Amino acid sequence: MLVVAFASLLGAARAIMMPIDDPTTSDKFQITYANESLWDTLVMKNKTALESGELFDLGPDTKCFLPNMTRLHEQNVQSVNDPEYKQKLIDTLDMGAHIIDASLKNQCLVSQNGFWTYRYCGSGDFTQYHGVAPDPNDKLTYTLGRSSKQIENREFQLLYDDYGYYISEIIESGDICDVTGTPRAIEIQYTCGNVMRPGTLQWTRETKICHYEAQVIVPDLCQLELLSKNQDKKNAVPIICHMSNDVPDKHNIVDIVSNYDVSFVANQVYFLLPMNNSNVDRALLMYTGNATEDGLEMDPFPMEIYKKFIDVMNKMLGLGLLSPPDGKPFDVHDSYQWIGDIVDMHGNYLNRLRLDVDVNMEATLIIDKSINFTGPNNFQWYFRGSDRTKNSKSRFGSLTNDNMMLAGGSIINVDDISKENAQELLEKLVAAGKLSGVIEDNKITQGSPIEASKTKVTKASESTPVSEKNKKAKTVTKTIIRSRDKEEYFKENEKQGEENNAQVPFSAHNNEQHGTISKSERKEENTNQKQLANTQKGDTDTPPQSSQSSANDKLSRSGMGQKEPGVDEIGSELRGNSKKALGSNIDNSSGRSTLNDNSDRIAVENEAREIINSNAYDQSEASVDPNYRNDQQRLNSAKEHTFSQSKEKKSINSEEILETKILNSETLGNNDGVASDVKDEEVVESDRNGVIDDEL
């Protein structure tokens, strides 16, 4: 079983679709079965009927007679010239305008169509926006037209098309169009239809630049005879059919059409809504394609099948074909589960479809024959968003690490789908450039510190593209090695460092992004740092702030005031190596150290300063140029120096560790002080356990 989730089904993330003709305004047909005697009398031996209609086959054993629709339209056009009929048109327009005003006054109709959402408030504005609600200050909110509040100032017209009469109103004074420089305008077509009061906004489309059309169905307009064409009992065209035997086959398409209101949706799929007088209570989805060749009966199903039915469900919701069980319009935060059977043209069962929509308008589509279906109608359950309380529980069930995936920044329920199938599904749904990041993120334990760091770096990298040469310096990794492998590990790193230095010279960095600093400036800064260190040996309680200010001045002049993604992680590595150079012995029960003796503090600080100013690690260059911090050769030299120091000095007081943090805060330009450094960076080394846990 495959599960397809498509985000924001009722909102902005849904694929853009063009509106199709409203199924409630299309032609209706009423099919009547006739035995052979009645068939001969009404059709086969009726010359007038044969001249005004046509015969056609509806299956191998069924013949039907359809009246000529063109002649019916011609008769309607000819009747317009009648004076009495003209007066009837005038009266219909006048009464229709008052019905529209009364029905939609203080009411707002909303419909979603792809990226955009449309809202029309009677005697008010017609708005196009993106999001949950229109915001006048948002750049993605446009007013397509402004209607007058007084009915006397509104202009209505009674027009006619292939589907019959409708009332048209053009409202103007919309927002200025960026292309034409003129106000936007929209034509609203009011029609009769069997929908819930006060009405529905069926569709909205842009016919030309900044000119729009919309269709609004007002059920009370069906009170007017000329506008009631869409009522089945008044406009259904009678079709007479005769079968070779007198007992209709329940699996024949004629039987399906006679019990359901059929509406074409998309992709060879029809929506079958039970008629009021039928003995069925569940809607169906009829697939008219070849189910075997198209893979509808396969398990698992081809992705093309899911794409077809995702489009189908989008259009069904956009056209309002699905109605809540209480008969009220959908609310923005309603959640429900809708289940419908998929049948072929003969009514044979093919498969079962389930649509889950949660309160965040996220939808999940499942096609599976094993879906349990026990409800009296198509809704297995339904929760009103307005009735939901903070303590109410969702019927979706709990999300665990085994049945959730990260896709587009949202966690979705994939109904216990296996991770292998989920990954295969994502490969088809997620863009190739994002798939690797999605899969990689899920390899890390949920909620771990390293995951948070990696997510932070990844997001920064997305906003600022990172070249292939700089990726190593911008990635957070986690390495755990045994003590017996230390020498082999660092030798391998040294070899890798030489390869990296050969492939990625410092000159290859993007100077426009990182800024530059000349060798003379580095030399001058180096001298200033050493002089400042010598002058402060007598007073080690005060951190050398002036060296940092000098470095910041040069960074500001060279355009390096902002840190690039990953610099904090590289700085963490350098600070860790400085601690190793002094050795460490941290209380494993707490992972923290305290400072008790001021004399030890001074001694440790002086010793650390001498090590950092030695040839093993030139801190002045590392503090000036962030790229220089990634020099693998200097990093390996510091690591080699670590082992030589650790052999001479097996342990050190926890006070000395804290002093190392203070020193690193000064040399690496960390102005946050000791407290923040202790809180953010903790490196634990235990020679007794032989494990190093290091974040690079």
Curated annotation (Swiss-Prot):
Family: Belongs to the OS-9 family.
Predominant location: endoplasmic reticulum
Binding site for a mannooligosaccharide derivative: W116, Q128, D178, R184, E206, Y212
Gene for this chain: YOS9
Lineage: Eukaryota, Fungi, Dikarya, Ascomycota, Saccharomycotina
Biased composition range(s): Polar residues: 458-467, 499-518, 528-553, 585-597
Localization (cell): Endoplasmic reticulum membrane
Protein name: Protein OS-9 homolog
Job description of the protein: Lectin involved in the quality control of the secretory pathway. As a member of the endoplasmic reticulum-associated degradation lumenal (ERAD-L) surveillance system, targets misfolded endoplasmic reticulum lumenal glycoproteins for degradation.
Domain of life: Eukaryota
Assembly: Interacts with missfolded ER lumenal proteins.
Ranges of residues in domain MRH: 106-224
Coiled coil regions in record: none
Pfam families assigned to the protein according to its UniProt record, in alphabetical order: PRKCSH, Yos9_DD
Disulfide bonds: C108-C121, C177-C210, C192-C222
Glycosylation sites: N35, N46, N68, N276, N290, N372, N588
Residue numbers spanned by region Disordered: 450-600, 667-696
Record field: compositional bias (Basic and acidic residues): 482-498, 685-696
This protein's UniProt keywords: Disulfide bond, Endoplasmic reticulum, Glycoprotein, Lectin, Membrane, Signal
Signal peptide: 1-15
GO cellular component: endoplasmic reticulum lumen; endoplasmic reticulum membrane
